[in-house]
Amino acid sequence: DAFFAVYIARRDKNDGSGFYTELKKNYIKLQASLKHNPVMKNEASEASDAILLNLEKVNAATIINYCHLVVSLLSKTNPTESDKANALHALSEAIGFLHGYRLLNPGFSRITTEQIDRNLERMNAPVQGQAACYRFVTQPETELVKLQQVISELKSIYGFSDQQIEDFRKNWITEQGR
């Protein structure tokens, strides 16, 4: 899908080792193995699993990007109304991407329903109950740490390196003028 392709490109440094390259490699592997079915059935399964995991990782990287943005905007000494609005927009995007995992059948994703729900709670957007996302604006000194916890948990779940977590701060399309 074209919309998700943009998110993939935003998280990819275009250095031949990112999400796009991994997805391309595994789509080619999947296509080749399906042409030689059933001889390459295991390869098709491996490629399919790798594609799904990579797409899941892109989603997690996008959540991390939005969490970084919220922390950056609301950590300012005097955030403007525009900063606050942009932070709440970014938070809403992160919540939406995280909530999207709940649409997957349990067992088909690396992240568990419990982990999703715990992180939605941290974002003040519980599955059951009243959302209180405004607290990130009204009480940033106590609330922003929760977004760092979300980042840390996603890092652990998906095995992201410290460098990747830093890289997820950036929109690589903008950075590289692509």
Label each region the model flagged.
Residues 1-178:
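Mature extracytoplasmic or organellar-lumen-exposed domains after removal of signal/transit peptides
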